[in-house]
Amino acid sequence: MRGLLIAFEGIDGSGKSSQAVLLKDWIEMRRDVYLTEWNSSEWIHDIIKEAKKKNMLTSITFSLIHATDFSDRYERYILPMLKSGFVVICDRYVYTAYARDVVRNVDFDWVKRLYSFAIKPNFTFYIRVTPEIALERIRKAKRKIKPQEAGIDILGEIPLEEGFLKYQSRIVEIYDKIAKEESNFITIDGNRPLKDVQIDIRKILGEYIDNSL
């Protein structure tokens, strides 16, 4: 049985995490599946969280510490699961690092080299929404905007909602550029209801997953 690597990308509030979970639940009825999230390495997660809280990361340190998290999960979980024939779903992949690091003025080619060890996903679903829609969803969920979601480390101390719109707009610009360059990127209109987005994703994957059993 062949392993399959699926990644979800998008700005905060895009609904990509919800789509990843919905897809996992659907695939579980067909074959083994594993879901991994960005910044979820057991031994470095708390370090990253504390460093962000204290706003003590330079642009390069920001890049390297997230690469450490990814490489740990990649070697201990992602690759072994793929070799065992699992469908591996990544809630954020290396493209998150590309976008967030470049926004912080880290050289794009340098970041790509940093993650050059990582294989390309079979499918990367870019759940594209406007920052305004993402912000409205966060409001409806009554969730507080995290300082890092508002880019306070690069924009300074401005109102969180204002920072969110500015920062996420920059992220969208980079994602759009990546989507044009990466052949495995599938741009999905995420401004629609979650159910409609998930239907489109399943239509794309259904036959491929069944044929890879």
Swiss-Prot record:
Molecular function terms, GO-annotated: ATP binding; dTMP kinase activity
Descriptive protein name: Probable thymidylate kinase 2
UniProtKB keywords: ATP-binding, Kinase, Nucleotide biosynthesis, Nucleotide-binding, Transferase
A GO CC term assigned to this protein in UniProt: cytoplasm
Catalytic function, reaction form: dTMP + ATP = dTDP + ADP
Family classification: Belongs to the thymidylate kinase family.
Binding residues annotated for ATP, in chain numbering: 10-17
One annotated GO biological process: dTTP biosynthetic process
Enzyme Commission code(s) on record: 2.7.4.9
